[in-house]
Swiss-Prot record:
Stated role: Attaches the virus to host cellular receptor, inducing endocytosis of the virion. In the endosome, the acidic pH induces conformational changes in the glycoprotein trimer, which trigger fusion between virus and cell membrane.
Cleavable signal peptide: 1-21
Main subcellular location: virion
Cell location: Virion membrane
Sequence ranges on the Intravirion membrane side: 574-591
Name of the protein in question: Glycoprotein
Membrane topology: Single-pass type I membrane protein
Keywords: Glycoprotein, Host-virus interaction, Membrane, Signal, Transmembrane, Transmembrane helix, Viral attachment to host cell, Viral envelope protein, Virion, Virus entry into host cell
Superkingdom, natural source: Viruses
One CC-aspect GO term: membrane
Virion surface-side positions: 22-552
Family: Belongs to the nucleorhabdovirus glycoprotein family.
Amino acid sequence: MSLIHLIYFPTILSLILGTEGTPALTYGNLADNQHGNEEQGDVDMYPLYECSKKGAGVSSNNWYGACRGACSMTKNTTDVHMEIYYRNDSVGWIDVLSIQTTEIWKHSHVTWYGECEHNTKYGSSNTAPVSVILERLEFLHNGMSSWPYGHSIHVHDTISSPDCSYFDDVSRSGWRLIISKRALELKSDIAGEGYIVDPDVGYVYPVADGIGKGRTWHVWKASSVPSSGCYFKSAGITNCTLLMDTFLYSCPSLNIAFSARVGKHIKSTCVGDMNISTDGVTYQTLGSTDQGSISTQLVSLWHQSQEALIQQLILTINEALGKIETSYCESTCDLTEMLISQHTEHPMVIETPVGPWLPYSIDGKVSVLPCQGGQDLVVIKPIEICASPFMLKVKSLKSLDTYWWVPTDSHVAPFTQCSNRDDEEMIIKIQRKKPLIFEFWRGAYKLDYPYNSSGIWLDNPGGHIHRSSKWFPTLDSLSYSSPINLPLISKGIRKHIQAIVSTTEITSGGNVTSWTHSISTIAEAMFDSAAIAAGRVVMWWYTLEESVKRYLTVAFGLVLTVITIWAMSKLFFRSSPTYARAPTNIEWVRS
């Protein structure tokens, strides 16, 4: 399997107008002998779309109904002025006391000398009854503001040592509370009720309870919920069209369409009364207007004209234009639905009359994810690279979220993750001195051996992304407020490759020019897997900070010194061999 797969789709525009799209540079793997131009400073590298989590998708049938409904020019429509919200799961932080409890027994005893002795015995760590914690809530709340965070432990016994009695030993039983303080994230559910998640076992505690039981007891002040933290955050105020044939709200300005059926009505939230649709969208209706059909609106507008003939002429022309426009729009929906139904493992974002969408499939069922087309995604500097598969780290300037971007895609999504594995195919190509090709949706970047100079850019004439207005497909030029061009990205790629090259064979005239290669060559002659392991160790060393390298060098030197001293001591101080004592009487033998 190649390092990266390059897959492009023809544009909707070429399908609608019947023209042949410009073919892509290649399909699948790019050839090693492909030629191109030197790096171009004006080739900007960005994903265009930010797509949602897979759980936010809608079925292809619902999407198709919303798309066709948006094309209706002759049916009566109702415009609803509404505000759309999304859940602001994290609304702040709250101080929580974690309380570990142990059963204890305290005894008093009078000695033979008349002294009073006290001692304490401890049982195993058990969870105390809730009554023990509730009886000391005031004490715990008072200490919450003064006790430090972290693992600083405050110990509190629920009983004191009993007074001594001259007639008998006295015993009491109770509990020892070992208390630590930390701040936990305060979250909210869909109904706007705050809750806390136990980080140890994952239990969920309603914030209004003030107490929760997991492996230990947890206590917090229910009244300490941040007043500024609202459970819902506005996604925007917009006009949505109620499509009666599918009973969906279509909100083109927010790129969203959802069911008009109310699944749940919530009262008195932090933003007022709200509706939750059957497909999970939270919104408030601010008013509605019956718009009627386009023709009806034109008649009411032009009724003020005294020229009946001109009025009729304008009406006729606009009805004709409306039918043409509707035809184009519905064709776009039909063709897009066909592309969605032919979902592949490497789909593209498709612009539609109801916004951009990304097809995906789960258990054989095709759905689409809503995407945002705002040009606010930038490549992070310094460049961060994932080796397998090849990805770049990007950041949203609006939400400040970071994503791993597969450069062959025009979109990013939160479910794309880096595996942090070395790419074996790339290592083999480096060992064979083959060109390395990094593919993007607008072309490919080719880096020739020895990988220490500027590469070349292979333009992809078919790498355009279909972008449309609400009705007619158009191709818009791209513009960015913070441009990141190819040289900046290629510099990061070359730096990443050099880290790999330092562990592979780099020869010049038969002489080894890298000391790290000697390790790799000897190991490879013995066993291939050992060579790869040694190379990875050296690559790991190459990526360490200088300060870390110094500490490790000192530690290794100390270990080596200790071993050497031990070996020398064994050599010089080993015991001498035993010798038998010579006899004192010598018997001479005479001939």
